[in-house]
Amino acid sequence: MPPLVLALLIGGVAGLRSMTAPTAIAWAAYAGWLPLGGTSLGWMGWWGTPWIFTLLAIGELVADKLPTTPSRKAPPGFIGRLVSGALCGAAIGLAASSLPLCIAAGLVGAVIGTFGGHAARMGLCRAFGTDLPAALVEDLAAIGIAAFAVASL
C-alpha cells in the first residue's frame, strides 16, 4: 500500500484514539516492519517504547469512557491528536523517504478521524441509546484500522 495512504490511515486512527496510533507504530518499529533505526524516530523501535505506548493506550481507552473526559474537539485533545497523527505519519515517511507528504497525510488523517469519529460516535450513541457501546465500537475500529495499517507496511 502506498505510504501516503498508510500515513492517512494511521493519522485517522490518531484522530479516533490518540495513543493507539503511536502504539501500533512502535510495535511495528520494534518488530522490524517499519525500519526506523538510524533515524530521528529510531526510539520508536526501542524495546521499552511499545510497552510504554501500550500502557498509555490502555489508559486512554479507559479514560475515554468516563463522563468527565473532555471532548476530542477541545483544543488540548485536538492538538494531541494532530501531534500523534503527524508523529505517526513522520515515522512512515522516514521509512519510505517521503517525510513531508506523510506528515501532511498524518495530519489530514487526524483531522478526519477526530471530526469523522465524533460524528460516527454520536450517530452510534443515538442508535444504541447510550454511549458505552458506541465507544467500544470506536475502540475496535481504531485498533482494527491500526492493525491493518501496520500489517500493510
Where are these regions (language model features)?
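The first (N-terminal) embedded transmembrane alpha-helix
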Residues: 9-29
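Alpha-helical transmembrane segments and their juxtamembrane interface "caps"
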Residues: 27, 31-35, 44-63, 77-81, ...
